[in-house]
Structure formats: C-alpha cells, structure tokens
C-alpha cells in the first residue's frame, strides 16, 4: 500500500496542467522503444500490445488501468476499469501528467499513450495524496469524452444542415405527370388492339378473310366513280 505523498505547489490543486508540462516534448508509445514481451509463459497475455498501463480484464472486453508511481519502488496507482482501451490509455496519460507536474516524476517529460493528452486533459499541477490523483484522473477522462461527444454531435448537425434537399415544385410534378401520360399512350394503344383481336377470336378473323376472297368482283357496267355506262363505245371506229 502506497503511503501519503505530500506535494506543495504555488498553484491551486484544481488548476489544469498548462505551460510547464504542455511545453515539454513528451514521448509517446509510438516514439518510445516497444514494450518488452511479458515473461509469463503459463498465463494468457492481458496487457495491451501498444498502450502503457492498460490491460484487459476478463472476457467482457473491458480494460483496466494501473500505473507505476515514479520514484517509489513497488508502488502502483489503480485508476479503475473502462469500457474502451482508449479510455484506460487516457487515464494513464492523465495520471502521469499529474504526477509529473507535481514533482513526483522528477519534473521531466513522461511517456504518454497520446501526444495530444498533454493539452486535452485538464489535470492538477499539485496534489496531496495519490487518492487526489485518482479522483482528478477520473474527472479529466470523463470531461475529455464529454467534450468529444459534444464536438461530434455539433459536426454532424452542421454537415446535415449544409446539404438541404431541393423541394419539388408544382411545375415539376405536372411535367412529370405529362411525360408519364405521353410515354404510356403507345403501350395503351397496342394493348387495346390486342384486346380487340382476342375478343373477336382468331378463327372468326380468318373466316371473314376467306369469305371476302370468295365474293365476286363488282360489275363492269359501273365506272370508276360508280356511274353507269349507258352505251358501249368501240375503241376503233373504222
């Protein structure tokens, strides 16, 4: 069990970690040497492959965070259980920034999981006990994810408002209805003809054609215009 860590600072315990720690160039897990593989061979590896201070807990997909307190051999600070690996990784960063700012880490740069944690996480610059650090870390991580959700909701609202749908006018609806009527008229005429033929019956149709072929041609006594020719006029009169 870690003892009480007394830290005195001119800043109030609630002020965020600003210029002193934010201006330092902190290392990250992407620039620091890779993590050494676990020495345990008989147990399943639960540590996160990239993030520091993060390991899996059980089969429910939850993650826990626990950090080593710099300068205090064998002392670890438990930070809690989180739903995502990023939440546990952010808690690690907040704890390291708070301990470093208070002088527990020697005042130098610490290794973070995310480089932007140095200015996105509001952590105290001084603390009296490690319990204060744990409480400040929980508030910093909760505030970080609350601001992220608010930003995502704002961006989604702005993107939906910048692309309004074009309203349909009455002229567009009338032209669309007219085009539909014109395009459907040839098809309706063809359907009408097919319906007439089907109602007559193909047998009756061909029978009427045969009957017309058996009819005698009109009499030659009628002219082309239907008037009767009164006398036969010879073609040659000599």
UniProtKB/Swiss-Prot annotation:
Induction: By high-salt and cold stress. Residues 50-115 bind DNA. SMART domains: AP2 (SM00380). Residues 9-22, 155-167 have a biased composition (Low complexity). GO terms for cellular component: nucleus. Its main location: nucleus. Residues 1-41, 155-188 are annotated as: Disordered. One of its GO terms (molecular function) is DNA binding. This is Dehydration-responsive element-binding protein 1A. The gene is DREB1A.
